[in-house]
């Protein structure tokens, strides 16, 4: 994405304090791989829950952008922290998908897995999707490309 003022903490590659998440498509899912550092901890060597929520929100927004070719706003996010994620983990996998649509409302499921493949965090989100034509006209967004 390249828009004037674009500096997303989740995905902007130029944001010096950002997570620099990159997404690709795997069937119905949008997927990212990311490695935490000690700068992302809450308790000693444990990935902060707020950082996990940020990752979940970002992946969910990307699934809307890619699968529906529009933008959306988060209305509700219900996160379940199932297992601690450690900041020295070899790398996380984030998976997000649209579970169902009702008019302009997307119901999204997103999960974070640790390097061993264990499900550590899962969330259900509700996003209000913007009208595609309005988004295209007002900000020039007509969809997005993902990493191959």
Name these PLM-found stretches.
Residues 1-38, 144-148:
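Non-catalytic linker/capping segments at the edges of enzyme domains
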Residues 11, 53-54, 58, 62:
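Short, residue-level hotspots on alpha-helical faces of the histone-fold
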Residues 17-19, 28-30, 50, 73-77, ...:
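A generic structural signal for short beta-strands and their flanking turns/coil linkers
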Residues 59-93, 98, 124:
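Hydrophobic beta-strand-centered segment that forms part of the acyl-chain substrate-binding groove
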Residues 86-88, 99-148:
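HotDog/MaoC-like acyl-thioester-processing domains
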């Amino acid at each position: 994405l390249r828009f004037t003022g674009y500096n997303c903490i989740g995905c902007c590659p130029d944001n010096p304090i950002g997570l620099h998440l990159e997404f690709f498509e795997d069937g119905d899912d949008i997927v990212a791989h990311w490695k935490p550092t000690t700068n992302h901890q809450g308790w000693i060597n444990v990935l902060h829950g707020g950082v996990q929520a940020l990752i979940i929100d970002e992946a969910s927004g990307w699934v809307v952008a890619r699968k529906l070719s529009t933008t959306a706003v988060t209305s509700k996010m219900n996160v379940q922290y199932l297992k601690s994620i450690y900041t020295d983990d070899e790398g996380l996998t984030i998976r997000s998908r649209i579970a169902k649509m009702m008019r302009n409302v997307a119901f999204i499921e997103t999960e974070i897995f640790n390097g061993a493949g264990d499900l550590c965090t899962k969330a259900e989100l509700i996003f209000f999707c913007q009208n595609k034509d309005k988004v295209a006209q007002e900000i020039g967004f007509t969809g997005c490309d993902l990493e191959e």
